[in-house]
């Protein structure tokens, strides 16, 4: 399997107008002998779309109904002025006391000398009854503001040592509370009720309870919920069209369409009364207007004209234009639905009359994810690279979220993750001195051996992304407020490759020019897997900070010194061999 797969789709525009799209540079793997131009400073590298989590998708049938409904020019429509919200799961932080409890027994005893002795015995760590914690809530709340965070432990016994009695030993039983303080994230559910998640076992505690039981007891002040933290955050105020044939709200300005059926009505939230649709969208209706059909609106507008003939002429022309426009729009929906139904493992974002969408499939069922087309995604500097598969780290300037971007895609999504594995195919190509090709949706970047100079850019004439207005497909030029061009990205790629090259064979005239290669060559002659392991160790060393390298060098030197001293001591101080004592009487033998 190649390092990266390059897959492009023809544009909707070429399908609608019947023209042949410009073919892509290649399909699948790019050839090693492909030629191109030197790096171009004006080739900007960005994903265009930010797509949602897979759980936010809608079925292809619902999407198709919303798309066709948006094309209706002759049916009566109702415009609803509404505000759309999304859940602001994290609304702040709250101080929580974690309380570990142990059963204890305290005894008093009078000695033979008349002294009073006290001692304490401890049982195993058990969870105390809730009554023990509730009886000391005031004490715990008072200490919450003064006790430090972290693992600083405050110990509190629920009983004191009993007074001594001259007639008998006295015993009491109770509990020892070992208390630590930390701040936990305060979250909210869909109904706007705050809750806390136990980080140890994952239990969920309603914030209004003030107490929760997991492996230990947890206590917090229910009244300490941040007043500024609202459970819902506005996604925007917009006009949505109620499509009666599918009973969906279509909100083109927010790129969203959802069911008009109310699944749940919530009262008195932090933003007022709200509706939750059957497909999970939270919104408030601010008013509605019956718009009627386009023709009806034109008649009411032009009724003020005294020229009946001109009025009729304008009406006729606009009805004709409306039918043409509707035809184009519905064709776009039909063709897009066909592309969605032919979902592949490497789909593209498709612009539609109801916004951009990304097809995906789960258990054989095709759905689409809503995407945002705002040009606010930038490549992070310094460049961060994932080796397998090849990805770049990007950041949203609006939400400040970071994503791993597969450069062959025009979109990013939160479910794309880096595996942090070395790419074996790339290592083999480096060992064979083959060109390395990094593919993007607008072309490919080719880096020739020895990988220490500027590469070349292979333009992809078919790498355009279909972008449309609400009705007619158009191709818009791209513009960015913070441009990141190819040289900046290629510099990061070359730096990443050099880290790999330092562990592979780099020869010049038969002489080894890298000391790290000697390790790799000897190991490879013995066993291939050992060579790869040694190379990875050296690559790991190459990526360490200088300060870390110094500490490790000192530690290794100390270990080596200790071993050497031990070996020398064994050599010089080993015991001498035993010798038998010579006899004192010598018997001479005479001939």
Swiss-Prot record:
Residues 22-552 are virion surface. The keyword Membrane applies. Keywords: Glycoprotein, Host-virus interaction, Membrane, Signal, Transmembrane, Transmembrane helix, Viral attachment to host cell, Viral envelope protein, Virion, Virus entry into host cell. The chain crosses the membrane at residues 553-573. Glycosylatedby host. Glycosylation is crucial for glycoprotein export at the cell surface. One of its GO terms (biological process) is symbiont entry into host cell. Its main location: virion. Residues 574-591 are intravirion. Attaches the virus to host cellular receptor, inducing endocytosis of the virion. In the endosome, the acidic pH induces conformational changes in the glycoprotein trimer, which trigger fusion between virus and cell membrane. Belongs to the nucleorhabdovirus glycoprotein family. Homotrimer. Interacts with matrix protein. This is Glycoprotein.
């Amino acid at each position: 399997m190649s390092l990266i797969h390059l897959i492009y789709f023809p544009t909707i525009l070429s399908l609608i107008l019947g023209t042949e799209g410009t073919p892509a540079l290649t399909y699948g793997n790019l050839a090693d002998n492909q030629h191109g131009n030197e790096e171009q400073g004006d080739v900007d590298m960005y994903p265009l779309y930010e797509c949602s989590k897979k759980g936010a998708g809608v079925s292809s049938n619902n999407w198709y109904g919303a798309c066709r409904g948006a094309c209706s020019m002759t049916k009566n429509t109702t415009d609803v002025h509404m505000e759309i919200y999304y859940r602001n799961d994290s609304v702040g932080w709250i101080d929580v006391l974690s309380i570990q409890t142990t059963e204890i027994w305290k005894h008093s005893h009078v000695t033979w000398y008349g002294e009073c002795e006290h001692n304490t015995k401890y049982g195993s760590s058990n969870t105390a009854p809730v009554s023990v914690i509730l009886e000391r809530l005031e004490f715990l709340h008072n200490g919450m503001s003064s006790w430090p965070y972290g693992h600083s432990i405050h110990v509190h016994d629920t009983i004191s040592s009993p007074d001594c009695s001259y007639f008998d030993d006295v015993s009491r039983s109770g509990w020892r509370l070992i208390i630590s303080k930390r701040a936990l994230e305060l979250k909210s559910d869909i109904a706007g009720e705050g809750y806390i998640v136990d980080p140890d076992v994952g239990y969920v505690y309603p914030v209004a309870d003030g107490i929760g039981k997991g492996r230990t007891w947890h206590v917090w002040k229910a009244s300490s919920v941040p007043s500024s933290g609202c459970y819902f955050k506005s996604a925007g105020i917009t006009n949505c069209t109620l499509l009666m044939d599918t009973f969906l709200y279509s909100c083109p300005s927010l790129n969203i369409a959802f069911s008009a059926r109310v699944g749940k009505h919530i009262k008195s939230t932090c933003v007022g009364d709200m509706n939750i649709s059957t497909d999970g969208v939270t919104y408030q209706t601010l008013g509605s207007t019956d718009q009627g059909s386009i023709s009806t609106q034109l008649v009411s507008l032009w009724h003020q004209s005294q020229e009946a003939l001109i009025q009729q002429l304008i009406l006729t022309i606009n009805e004709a234009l409306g039918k043409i426009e509707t035809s184009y729009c519905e064709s776009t929906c039909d063709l897009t639905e066909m592309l969605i139904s032919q979902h592949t493992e490497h789909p593209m974002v498709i612009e539609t009359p109801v916004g951009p969408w990304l097809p995906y499939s789960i258990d054989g069922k095709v759905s689409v994810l809503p995407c945002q087309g705002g040009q606010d995604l930038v490549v992070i500097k310094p460049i961060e690279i994932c080796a397998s598969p090849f990805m770049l780290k990007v950041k949203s300037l609006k939400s400040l979220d970071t994503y791993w971007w597969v450069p062959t895609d025009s979109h990013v999504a939160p479910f794309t993750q880096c595996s942090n594995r070395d790419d074996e195919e790339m290592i083999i190509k480096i060992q064979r001195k083959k060109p390395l090709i990094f593919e993007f949706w607008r072309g490919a970047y080719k880096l020739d051996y020895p990988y220490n100079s500027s590469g070349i850019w292979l333009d992809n004439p078919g790498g355009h992304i279909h972008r449309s207005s609400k009705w007619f497909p158009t191709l818009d030029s791209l513009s960015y407020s913070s441009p990141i061009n190819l040289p900046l990205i290629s510099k990061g790629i070359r730096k990443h490759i050099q880290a790999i090259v330092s562990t592979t064979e780099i020869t010049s005239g038969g002489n080894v020019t890298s000391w790290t290669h000697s390790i790799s060559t000897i190991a490879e002659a013995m066993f291939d897997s050992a060579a790869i392991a040694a190379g990875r160790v050296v690559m790991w060393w190459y990526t360490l900070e200088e300060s870390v390298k110094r500490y490790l060098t000192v530690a290794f030197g100390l270990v080596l010194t200790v071993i050497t001293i031990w070996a020398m001591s064994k050599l010089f101080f080993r015991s001498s061999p035993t010798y038998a004592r010579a006899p004192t009487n010598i018997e001479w033998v005479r001939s």
